[in-house]
């Protein structure tokens, strides 16, 4: 891994489509909300979300089709059946102390529209015909509440679009040029870190410690895959994927331990401007880059001893699984938090970033 440290002060600006952390035992509705996709221009998509119920709902926007961040809101296939490369961000959100601004209120039988340009987060420069669809789970709270009481699954219609490649290529990328107010210094050896290259010594120390802890947790987890079948089955469901899971943990351990030979670049600050409120860290898988956000340092402990909780070490581990340079295919955000992650099918779990972070936490804490 290559760690780059920005001299600039941290900037704070405002994923695949998945559910957030759902408390154990809460109901999941198959038909509470409806999502319909329609074309709104060359590469513009309009999602119409309808509350089919008879009571108002607060819908958590994180990791859903309503997310304001440039996450993967829809899956896109070209006319030859190949998945279109995603060029947006995969954020990890803080899953506690949810604020009212993280939610969207929807009255009974009410409808809200959310439009987004898929060319801002996908390479559509070839143009042609594309097929889009959206599916996922939206955590829900009662009206005027942020207490998650249930979840609503959704499966949209298939939308077929004919896109002009040149016009799509002219759309500005949602994650663009790094916002650098000063030069970067590459850290070639952790034992020889130039502390003057970082504007905040404490943050650099925290990141370095998190990488070290990520390496240790990943190594422990790789061993646990073969030694603790009960725990493995809790998270990954099928023993036929054990070698894949073990291999990914070993790859993350190697990447976390590397100083200048890894395939990823890890930034201790948000030079790309992707840290909206609630984002702990995020990955740009198309670039194999990871960025920490201010609350990664201010609101996460280095290494928690609480089951299913978030910390700096497992957040770093989580983000590294999103990078194709670590292991391909890279992990998605199929299920967020313990309840959703452990409810996934084996096929989804083995490609879910939080399943690896939560398993590592469970192995370390002894959950």
From Swiss-Prot:
GO MF term set: metal ion binding; metalloendopeptidase activity
Principal cellular location given in the protein's record: secreted
Top enzyme class: hydrolase
Record has Hydrolase as a keyword: yes
Family matches, as Gene3D superfamilies: 2.60.40.2970, Collagenase (Catalytic Domain)
EC number in record: 3.4.24.39
CDD domains to which the protein is assigned, alphabetical: M35_deuterolysin_like (cd11008)
BP terms from Gene Ontology: proteolysis
Signal peptide interval: 1-19
Assigned GO CC terms: extracellular region
Propeptide residues per the UniProt entry: 20-190
Cofactor note: Binds 1 zinc ion per subunit.
Pfam family, one: Peptidase_M35
Catalytic reaction(s) noted: Preferential cleavage of bonds with hydrophobic residues in P1'. Also 3-Asn-|-Gln-4 and 8-Gly-|-Ser-9 bonds in insulin B chain
Binding residues annotated for Zn(2+), in chain numbering: 318, 322, 333
Stored PANTHER family: NEUTRAL PROTEASE 2-RELATED (PTHR37016:SF3), PTHR37016
Physiological role: Probable secreted metalloprotease that shows high activities on basic nuclear substrates such as histone and protamine. May be involved in virulence.
Name used for this protein in its record: Probable neutral protease 2 homolog MCYG_00239
């Amino acid at each position: 891994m290559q760690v780059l440290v920005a001299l600039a002060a941290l900037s704070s600006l405002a994923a695949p489509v998945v559910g957030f952390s759902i408390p154990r035992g809460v109901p999941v509705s198959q038909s509470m909300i409806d999502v319909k996709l329609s074309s709104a221009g060359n590469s513009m998509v309009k999602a119409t979300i309808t509350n089919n119920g008879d009571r108002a709902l607060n819908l958590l926007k994180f990791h859903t089709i309503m997310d304001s961040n440039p996450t993967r809101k829809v899956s896109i296939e070209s006319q030859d059946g190949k998945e279109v490369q995603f060029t947006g961000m995969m954020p990890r959100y803080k899953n506690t102390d949810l604020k009212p601004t993280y939610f969207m209120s929807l009255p009974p039988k009410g409808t809200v529209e959310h439009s987004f340009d898929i060319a801002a987060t996908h390479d559509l420069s070839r143009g042609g015909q594309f097929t889009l669809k959206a599916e996922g789970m939206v955590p829900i709270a009662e009206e005027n509440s942020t207490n998650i009481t249930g979840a609503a699954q959704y499966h949209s219609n298939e939308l077929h679009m004919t896109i002009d490649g040149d016009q799509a290529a002219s759309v500005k990328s949602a994650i663009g040029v790094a916002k650098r107010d000063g030069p970067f210094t590459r850290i070639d050896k952790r034992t020889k870190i130039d502390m003057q290259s970082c504007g905040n010594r404490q943050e650099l120390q925290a990141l370095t410690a998190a990488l070290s802890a990520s390496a240790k947790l990943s190594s422990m987890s790789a061993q646990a895959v073969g030694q603790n079948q009960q725990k493995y089955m809790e998270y990954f469901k099928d023993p036929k994927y054990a070698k894949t899971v073990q291999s990914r943990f070993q790859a993350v351990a190697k990447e976390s331990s590397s100083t200048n030979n890894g395939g990823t670049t890890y930034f201790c600050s948000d030079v790309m401007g992707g840290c909206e409120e609630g984002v702990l860290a995020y990955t740009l898988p198309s670039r194999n880059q990871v960025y920490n956000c201010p609350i990664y340092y201010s609101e996460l402990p280095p290494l928690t001893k609480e089951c299913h909780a978030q910390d700096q070490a497992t957040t770093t581990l989580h983000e590294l699984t999103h990078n194709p340079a670590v292991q391909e295919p890279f992990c998605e955000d199929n299920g967020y938090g313990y309840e959703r992650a452990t409810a996934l099918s084996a096929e989804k779990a083995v490609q879910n970033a939080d399943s690896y972070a939560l398993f590592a936490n469970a192995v370390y804490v002894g959950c």
